[in-house]
């Protein structure tokens, strides 16, 4: 199964509570014609609200969001958008965090 049809860009939702990082990542991704950032969220609740409407192919998700770990957020995101793939982002070197991801 492919994530996006060859005639359209891969759609992305970027979820990270650090605005500067999130905006920088969006700017970087925007340079690739094969990618289209369709939305951004600063926390899991906002992402859960956006995903059913935006239906992104891929969700780029920070592992450490306010009030919820990324692994827990993935469960909720899969419920509202089972077709979306989730790519977790983290700067953590904690082996338990990495194993859970």
Which residues fall in each region the model found?
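Conserved active-site segment of CheY-like receiver
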Residues: 17, 89-93
């Amino acid at each position: 199964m492919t994530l996006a049809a060859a005639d359209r860009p891969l759609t992305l939702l970027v979820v990270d509570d650090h605005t500067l990082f999130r905006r920088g990542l969006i700017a970087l991704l925007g340079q690739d014609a094969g990618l289209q950032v369709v939305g951004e969220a600063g926390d899991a609740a906002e992402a859960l609200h956006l995903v059913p409407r935006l239906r992104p192919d891929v969700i780029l998700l920070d592992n450490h969001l306010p009030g919820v770990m990324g692994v827990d957020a993935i469960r909720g995101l899969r419920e509202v958008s089972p077709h979306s793939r989730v790519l977790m982002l983290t700067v953590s070197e904690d082996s338990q965090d990495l194993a859970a991801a």
